[in-house]
């Protein structure tokens, strides 16, 4: 759908929801301000679930609509160009280290999700690997395999989530390599960002 039509539809949705209230208050619904140019490569945070793919393989990508099935994805136009490569590299590193993917139905396995944050104004890249266990076997080898495949990553953190939940992140973080945080600049301010920090996923639109 062309971006101009997306914006028009959003404008119509807001008007349908709030139009009567705005009119009652004698207010004005201003035109939605969209991004400059086409909305591609704008998401500086990306996440993926992992699942068994048979014969020791691991798949990652996006959930199919209305289904727990994961559709593999090698690239996503909405995300920072670095993001999907890094998320896929985690899956390949887990395969090399024989780290099993999480099974939602059984609640077994290790690798649940990964979340990557890519700097907008810096080259920092924070990777958070979400596991179903507190202690990884030979974490150093796992980290080395990720770094070999994705040298742009500047820090790797393990997040522990052992709950049977749809929430991606748990409450415990263990830094596996690097500072455990990243830094980015937005609107003239420098932010230190951790695995659970709220930060704008679309910095260009924010500015």
Regions found by a protein language model. Give the residues of each.
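Accessory RNA-recognition modules of RNA-modification enzymes
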Residues: 1-207
